[in-house]
Amino acid sequence: MSRASLLRILLSSLSISSSAATASVGNAQTTTPAAGWARAGTQGDFVVTDFTFRSGERLPELRLHYTTIGTPQRDARGIVRNAVMILHGTGGTGRSFLSTAYAGELFAPGKLLDSAKYFIVLPDGIGHGGSSKPSDGLHARFPKYTYDDMVTAQHRLLTEHLKVNHLRLIMGTSMGCMHGWVWGHTYPEFMDGLAPYACVPAQIAGRNRMIRTMAMDAIRSDPAWKGGEYTSTPPGLRAAQMMLYIMSSAPLVQQTQAPTRDKADSVIRAYLDARMATTDANDFLYQFDASRDYDPSPNLSRITAPALFINSADDQVNPPELGMAERYAAMMPRTKFILLPITPETRGHGTHSAPKVWGEYLRAFLTALPQR
């Protein structure tokens, strides 16, 4: 198997998505699924003027990049009834979902979220993809955004630019899963349902927070980082990526993919080389630091939308032995929590992007989900 093939398999099992599908900045670009999922959809940008962050910092212009597939449909009252927004994980983009394994299983004709019936919205979060981010030029002077800022921006993209006043469903993976909970208590009537996958609705602590802190410290403590004003990639980013790999990987998946010493060395080197070639250190820092004040747990009683909450037993980011998902799900009477058992089809934390594993649960949820 080639290094490229190994890398594609590896990236599919991790929460961080490949950014090979780049954005068309400045102009909307439309293609159809017939051209291949990697080129599907309409891309565009919404520029918010004088955006104020929770920190009090401001940007004169905040660019929000997005991809849409399908057409919004309104009822007699003008309420959009078929919009589904899917929120990506840390380091990913909206177009991360445009793969055969994901879009082909969900958006294709006759599939669960057939884009002929649904209006699919795939935003790039602040600091990610084609949206405004530190590497655009401000570097470490970029505003210190949080998940609350990212959700506020998503809401403005929908309501002010796309003219979507209601969502049938909000899906989210990893960071997007956490954004889903923030959406649920910040805009509780905006959606019919939530489908957050691979997170917990509580502050990031314990091993999860420790690894994130070590990864960020690996960059900040590197003299080559130069306070964010580096001219070449600081080596500390490689150490940070190693920690990310440890956090996101799953023993069974990695043993299957790399059953020999040489294969294991080849896989990890290919992964690290690819990440170093496509990741900016400041963007990485901001993306992980954005979770610093995430904690929806005090507001769970405000979440009134039904939710299908799914984690997998081989997720090392959200290990099931902690019992946290069950504990917090019990605080939300309209939330159904499912812990997927480990199988050859699960992918650790990356199971969040494997519709073949959880698709039937989502089908049952959508079938029973009332309009609000």
Q: Can you name each region flagged by the protein language model?
A:
Residues A313-K336:
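Conserved loop-alpha-helix segment in the C-terminal half of the alpha/beta-hydrolase fold
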Residues F190-A274:
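Alpha/beta-hydrolase-fold enzymes
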Residues D283-N299:
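Active-site nucleophile elbow and catalytic-triad environment of alpha/beta-hydrolase enzymes
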Residues L167-A205:
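Conserved hydrolase catalytic core segment
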Residues T67-D136, M324:
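N-terminal cap/lid subdomain of alpha/beta-hydrolase-fold enzymes
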Residues I303, F309-N311:
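Short beta-strand/loop motif that positions the catalytic acidic residue
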Residues T335-R372:
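Catalytic active-site module of serine/aspartate enzymes centered on a nucleophile-bearing elbow/loop
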Residues D148-R168:
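Conserved acidic catalytic loop of the alpha/beta-hydrolase fold
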